[in-house]
């Protein structure tokens, strides 16, 4: 059986090598665009490697040998170590062309379980911002929700740039991860709110905590006001505003809406008054208010 701690048994000693200056510059560009952290950095950090961002990408053959030694010396399972080596061989395969299958050959030789391969290939694509390819692997039913918060955050931020939130929502609906950080939850909810007001409301109702629900509800309203007030894509913003005012709200949610638009942060929006009036029309309250005014005027 292959001894993965022996460098020449893992990495080719001849042929083209990926870790030249161009690769390093390209990787640093990807790292910068991903808020300074690649997914392989997180994996190496989980192995206990100090300053993972300096370990990858390795600089030349000497750097690769040093990284290999660090990985093999880590106090983690063999599968965890092999996962990193698999990732590094994906770099080699990409550099050598489509016929190169060094990563898969290693996995077969050492019996690396398929779910480890799927995860690392998905993270490899994430680090190259090939998000559609990444999700083909990361949404696989055999995988636990590893790095779910970070994956959601990266995909939503990309959605802010493209205006398309289909990828983070596809990942969320496929994996159904329990998000651990408030920032990841906020990013997911932002994607939901910009895609479907109704779905975002339903999501907010899954939270038993009253305060958390109110906060999410107010963020939903804020996202509609922001788009409606900025004049972004008039047809879409009008449709979202109509969807908001037509929601079947509970009594508590109705109060949250009124309070947010009349005395809360929402009152600062140029669209607040219009949304209040639209809601009154939809719920019939405008007629009720008109009748009250008529009675008071003696009509």
Curated annotation (Swiss-Prot):
Biological processes, Gene Ontology terms: mRNA transport; protein transport
Entry GO terms, CC: nuclear pore
Pfam (any one): ELYS
Subcellular location: Nucleus, Nuclear pore complex
Record keywords, A-Z: mRNA transport, Nuclear pore complex, Nucleus, Protein transport, Translocation, Transport
Database matches in InterPro entries: ELYS_dom
Family from the record: Belongs to the ELYS family.
Function description: Required for the assembly of a functional nuclear pore complex (NPC).
Subunit and partners: The nuclear pore complex (NPC) constitutes the exclusive means of nucleocytoplasmic transport. NPCs allow the passive diffusion of ions and small molecules and the active, nuclear transport receptor-mediated bidirectional transport of macromolecules such as proteins, RNAs, ribonucleoparticles (RNPs), and ribosomal subunits across the nuclear envelope.
Annotated protein name in UniProt: Protein ELYS
Organism: Chaetomium thermophilum (strain DSM 1495 / CBS 144.50 / IMI 039719) (Thermochaetoides thermophila)
